[in-house]
Amino acid sequence: MNRMKSVAFRLALVLAAAIVLLSPACLLYAQQQPAPAPAPPSTPPPDAKAAAKPTPTDEMEEFAPKPAPPLPAGMTGSDTKDRRYTLKAGMYNAGEAAMGMKHVFFLKKPGPFRLDATSPDDPQVDKTLTLLGVRDKSKMPKLLKPVIAQLAYANSDFAFQGSHLFQGNFYGVSIYDIANPAKTSLLTTLVCPGGQGDVSVYGNLLFMSVEMPNGRLDCGVQGFPPEPPPAAGHEKERHPPAAQKDRFRGVRIFDVSDIKNPKQVAAVQTCRGSHTHTLVVDPNDKDNVYIYVSGTSFVRQPAELAGCSGEEPGKDANTALFRIDVIKVPVAAPQEAKVVSSPRVFIDPRTGALNGLNNGGSHDKGAEKPKDTNQCHDITVYSALGLAAGACSGNGLLLDIKDPVHPKRLDAVNDPNYSYWHSASFSNDGTKVVFTDEWGGGLGARCRPNDPNKWGADAIFHLTDDKLSLASYYKLPAAQSDTENCVAHNGSLIPVPGRDIEVQSWYQGGISVMDFTDAAHPFEIAYFDRGPIDAKTLVLGGDWSAYWYNGYIYGSEIARGLDVYQLTPSKFLTRNELDA
């Protein structure tokens, strides 16, 4: 659910700090490039004031999608001849296109995770915005209100165990029975707001990430009172919300031994909350599992959690920036889970400076100097090899995790074509790593015809002797419209002997299956795509995640629900390979 300069989207993918920082010109209806600053308007004469009053159309014009700028020299864009480019728009009746895979089943979001209100005057919309912490709804364009409110119920990531699927949501978790994927059924919903709902499961334990300031220790839906609006002249100042003893930001742990009745057994607080987390199983430790916590949001007040500091390292060597957190979870006593270390994975080993890495300069930062990397967005582990790949905003990291409490950096890379290092996947043999770039934060249209195919793409690296070397890029080949948020996002390997194949979500770009066996020449072998949710305005939707599990592919559709797919034989993938 980082990082674009759009007037409409000054917000990280998953709200996180955005709920505190939310301004009227924030979300969902995206102006794709910053507009030139308008000239100061002259005061209209008295008889012109009525005519100057904005109409609903006028107030939304600022948020209308804009086409991409011309391609930079030497860059190529996406294919407008692909049939995915012109699919009909619609929420549940959009056009569809597929190759090498078929759609098996679809379930709409369960009731607790849907906001059916569409009118900005609906009391439920106002209530939801209040729970999100929106400071001053009166300044928000009226037609934008129900769309922003929908973000409180966005679907996010998946976890699997046995015949159960756990689908995270900004409002909690849905648990499904997938014993028969073609007849997937909802078992229960766990209402527990706080976003973004990144989930993982181990035995009878379910872990969920929470980073938004409306999260409560008791999973209550009432949130907290919005912060008072800033005083005149201080509108641009940003501060963490006032301390609340019942606020929760970190990793929740549930006992799901009774699958229809999950019980929270622990809630481990962290200074920046948990944007994502990664389950780490140590082959040499059967009594504990470990959670790597990636926090990308603001640092909370020390009055709310002792020891939290958002200062730069030069002012406070104990800053909560420039680190990850490690939680140790005793499997037999999860209520005793706690943070046991906060590794400084960005440190300069020569000088000891905590801010030892930077992005090297990025194409979307203009003339800005290289920015220090102070957070990881997501970490992928390969426990059998004792390695982890960290996608850490400005850098891709390779970590030694043989001692899971004290991971050590082996290598770090950056790339001027990358805006925000988002996630990573190892090849099955551990000789390649695929990193993703979430250019636009997942909230912008970044697969338009003139969007370069090296921006918002996968970067495929060789991994040799603990060093990463770039081999190539891969981006969804088909162009997408101005009203479809689209960029590289979450995926997983598909186990085909002798080949490296990954299924991957691209938000409203749909699902693309990539063969990267030859790391220098990746290519698409299957896809499924729907048309945009809306033909005229960019409404956040599409696949957050696409994962292969036991012969099926599951898609977590942000706005619509849950999809089930199967690969089909094609010139790229034989029946024997599918059955292997």
Residue ranges of predicted features:
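Bacterial N-terminal signal peptides that target proteins for export
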Residues: N2-L15
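Residues at the start of alpha-helices and the adjacent loop-to-helix junctions
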Residues: A8-F9, L22, P416
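Bacterial N-terminal signal peptides
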Residues: A12-A25
